[in-house]
């Protein structure tokens, strides 16, 4: 059946009515927790194990819709902050659940990449709510460092990643690696280099090998 009603639908979203979902028998949260537990038990003593979740901003976009959420920024910012409080609390509770199993957390903020939003929006609505999660994880658990991940050229957002407390970033092939290196120097931040996905789609090993070589050269010393 289709969705006939939704508390965040329309011009006056009922954010206060949203409840934070909990683990229930057979629901997705339980399935995720069980899967993470199995992986940690199997290989957690050999490698870092990360569990993935949507970051607070991306969760807010999924709930409200991108166009409506952006419109809310200009109509009533307090409405957006109220929703971000909810999604950040959801992320904190889910991180608790996964970190207790021995996994680190990846916060995927795919909806926060440029040019979907600009750096000012990122600073006000992405940084503080992701920082709430990363600080919580760092304070309570001895697990792999929390990661904030998104695609695209992250060069202009590097300072904000540092402010948000990430311990790992994904750096696309087209980023300014010298600038990234300058911002991560002396900090415990892992930089994960990413080749152009189109090179992988084409399936030509020679061009892919060349792309990997260029990426390795650009990231040398990080």
Model region roles, listed by residue range:
Residues 1-22, 38-41, 45-46:
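A contiguous, low-structure linker/loop signature
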Residues 23-222:
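Active-site loop segments of alpha/beta catalytic cores
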């Amino acid at each position: 059946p289709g969705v006939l009603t939704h508390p965040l639908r329309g011009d006056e979203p009922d954010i206060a009515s949203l409840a934070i979902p909990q683990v229930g028998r057979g629901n997705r949260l339980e399935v995720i927790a069980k899967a993470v537990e199995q992986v940690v038990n199997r290989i957690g003593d050999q490698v870092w194990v990360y569990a993935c979740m949507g970051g607070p901003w991306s969760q807010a976009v999924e709930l409200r819709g991108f166009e409506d959420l952006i419109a809310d920024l200009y109509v009533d910012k307090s409405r957006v902050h109220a929703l971000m409080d909810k999604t950040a609390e959801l992320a904190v509770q889910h991180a608790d659940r996964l970190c207790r199993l021995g996994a680190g957390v990846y916060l995927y903020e795919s909806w926060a990449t440029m040019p979907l939003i600009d750096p000012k929006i990122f600073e006000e609505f992405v940084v503080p709510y992701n920082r709430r999660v990363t600080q919580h994880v760092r304070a309570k658990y001895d697990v792999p460092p929390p990661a904030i991940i998104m695609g695209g050229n992250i060069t202009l957002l590097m300072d904000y990643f540092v402010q948000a407390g990430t311990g790992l970033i994904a750096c696309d092939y087209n980023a300014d690696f010298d600038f990234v290196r300058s911002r991560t120097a002396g900090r415990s931040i892992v930089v994960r280099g990413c080749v152009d996905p189109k090179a992988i789609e084409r399936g030509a090993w020679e061009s892919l090998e060349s792309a990997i070589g260029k990426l390795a050269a650009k990231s040398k010393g990080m």
